[in-house]
């Protein structure tokens, strides 16, 4: 096997998806703790700023620049290298979160045992569906009272439309929590509260019949458990590796992240069964991870809010080959060879200069405004990775200037911020309005702040009568022109020059779709096929 094949086979690149407060940050810390990346959980700081008011958050971010460290964490576990990509939760949720999911090979879904499947989880699952991303599920907060585990599995199957295969099963819950049973190995892991946030290996009995177990959990509980397990194993699906890797089945684990309980069986199972880096589609051909030449795409750009250094870091997922420090690569969109100097790698909580990186790894490239989201880098081959979409925004505002003479700076600022993925920017065909689109409200605050700070533009964002947007395509140029003439009042151009239908209401969108059967209305737009226009 080649060096690239060996290294690729060791990589596990994934993201954690959850609704805010399901325990994602805590679980992230505990995975790093069990992975040996940190000695004491709590030293990886989540975006605690999300708990402050928005204004505090901006001031905080300004003081420290945005911390890049919370975005990618790499740690070794057994003989594997795990890359954990953070998906921002809370109010700073934006398209960023969706796009991180295009850069991973699998995902871990965290569900609060008391709340079950929540709205954000449903949205993130839809994004995973676009690429049939394999998903494991961790039902968290087992140390509190929650829903019946069988009902929870049923809820996941019904609401998210994915088959569940329980791998561990709880023995009690809340005050009565005694441990979990591993349904595949038969082992019983007893519950002991994690002390001082240090790694804690729980007491393990080899089976339900092991001597001493009945004394530990009580004979009555053991009898109830046997009955419940018979029911569960009769009614649920056994784990099927192929179905999991095809995104059709999710293995389910139970535990309590805050108490370090149930994390170890999850991590062991994850590194054994989660997929290594997979082949990826491009505009030209399918690129296999084990190919010798480097290729990768940018899925996120993180701006540094320090005005002294206008540097931005572009996060590139390596898809094939080997990256070595200082190597030259083709920036496909511009056609220029670029020296990838001082690229960063992220080891738990440190930024380090990357000496090398392999398929599945993520490196940070310094970017002075020339790199956009979706850009591909290769060792000379002209191809672009597909599957890095823009998502139709759900919130819209019109930008208005306090000083009309700053129009040029406003247009420049919006164009650059939309390239970076901070917002989307539309120009209606029939007016001079500048309309911004976002997935989360905080995106508007970030844009307003950065326009003022970086471009000297004081803009007000007003409500606008747009409810949703769809990119429009038609293979017949004559039909497209007809559609354009009839609907000019609702059409606009995005920052990449693509035609967009800006619908004032959902009903209006439905009618437009019915009246123009030859026109495709799309809720996502591929970066690979966008052609930038000024």
Swiss-Prot record:
Domain tr-type G, chain residue ranges per copy: 9-278
Entry function: Increases the formation of ribosomal termination complexes and stimulates activities of RF-1 and RF-2. It binds guanine nucleotides and has strong preference for UGA stop codons. It may interact directly with the ribosome. The stimulation of RF-1 and RF-2 is significantly reduced by GTP and GDP, but not by GMP.
Lineage summary: Bacteria, Pseudomonadati, Pseudomonadota, Gammaproteobacteria, Lysobacterales
Organism for this UniProt entry: Xanthomonas campestris pv. campestris (strain ATCC 33913 / DSM 3586 / NCPPB 528 / LMG 568 / P 25)
Tagged with keyword GTP-binding: yes
PANTHER family from the UniProt entry: PEPTIDE CHAIN RELEASE FACTOR RF3
Database matches in PROSITE patterns: G_TR_1, G_TR_2
Any GO CC annotation of this UniProt entry: cytosol
Pfam families given in the database record: EF-G_D2, GTP_EFTU, RF3_C
Name used for this protein in its record: Peptide chain release factor 3
Keyword Chaperone: no
Keywords recorded for this protein, A-Z: Cytoplasm, GTP-binding, Nucleotide-binding, Protein biosynthesis
Protein family membership: Belongs to the TRAFAC class translation factor GTPase superfamily. Classic translation factor GTPase family. PrfC subfamily.
Domain of life: Bacteria
GO process terms (BP): regulation of translational termination; translational termination
Any GO molecular function: translation release factor activity, codon specific
Binding site for GTP: 18-25, 86-90, 140-143
Cellular localisation: Cytoplasm
Gene name for this UniProt entry: prfC
